[in-house]
């Protein structure tokens, strides 16, 4: 999870969920190393491939290639899920504490072909989300 969203008031949640802090500026590879090690040990991680909360909602924004690269490198299976109707707040603490009717839709469990590249995986995941949600693609 992006370090800036990991508010101290919720430290017990981050520890309980074994949430991996990620520096989104690309200067810290510790989170990536932990995630790769976890995947190689048959662990599970959750990734938001857009690299943050993007506006407008209801559109499929470009994905960063990190998720696809991790999948290609570790051969991990992907449980494609869509999170929707979350609170739209400027602060994480407000979003976490506001009552909502958020949904999580589990779309498919995907095993990519052995030779798939990170870019191919990223493109396919993005296509599948757009196909499932009927949301337009942002280029």
Question: What name fits each language-model region?
Answer:
Residues 1-27, 34:
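Catalytic core of membrane glycerolipid acyltransferases/transacylases, capturing the structured
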Residues 30-139:
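Non-catalytic C-terminal accessory region of glycerolipid acyltransferases
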């Amino acid at each position: 999870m992006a370090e800036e969203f990991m508010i101290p008031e919720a430290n017990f949640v981050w520890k309980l969920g074994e949430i991996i802090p990620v520096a989104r500026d690309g200067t810290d590879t510790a989170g990536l190393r932990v995630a790769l090690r976890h995947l190689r040990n048959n662990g599970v991680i959750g990734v938001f491939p857009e690299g943050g909360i993007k506006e407008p909602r209801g559109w499929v924004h470009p994905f960063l290639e990190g998720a696809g690269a991790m999948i290609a490198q570790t051969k991990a299976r992907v449980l494609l899920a869509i999170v929707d109707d979350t609170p739209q707040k400027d602060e994480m603490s407000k979003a976490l504490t506001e009552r909502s009717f958020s949904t999580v839709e589990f779309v498919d469990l995907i095993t990519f072909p052995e030779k798939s590249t990170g870019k191919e995986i990223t493109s396919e995941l993005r296509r599948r989300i757009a196909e499932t949600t009927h949301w337009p693609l942002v280029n």
